[in-house]
Amino acid sequence: MSESRPLFAFAFRSGLGHMLCDFADADASGDNVDFVWVHLDLSEATAQAWLRRRPWPADVIEMVAAPIQRGRLFIARDMVYGHLRDFRDEPDAVTLQAGSLCVVASRSLLVTGRRIPLRSVSEVRSRVEARTIRPEPVRADHGILSSSE
């Protein structure tokens, strides 16, 4: 990974993702898109530095940057943030190993991060790249978020 790149980033317009090249593209695309998804390797110093430059409260940044194994989301006035439990993306592993995905979601920016590869991120990324994700709400199967319907 280069010094100025997330693991990957997409800008979404009309429900379709367009891959972004680096942090500068992610920062610059804000007003021209519906939302931006940036996925970080939180073990990288560059990713941590980019995360700390976000205009979010310090406690939000510290929570998502921390290497913790907590499965909990918090709702603030203009964002949802925290950690989701997931499984490591290790195709040759005999057993499933737990992992943690950090999340910060606002209306225009979704930031996810991990220290190890995770299955759900790999699956969503492959669907975005294949243009198969439909522009509809994603069901939260973790039992943490649920709709009122």
Can you describe what each PLM-predicted range is?
Residues 1-149:
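Peripheral, non-transmembrane regulatory/ligand-interaction domains of membrane transport proteins
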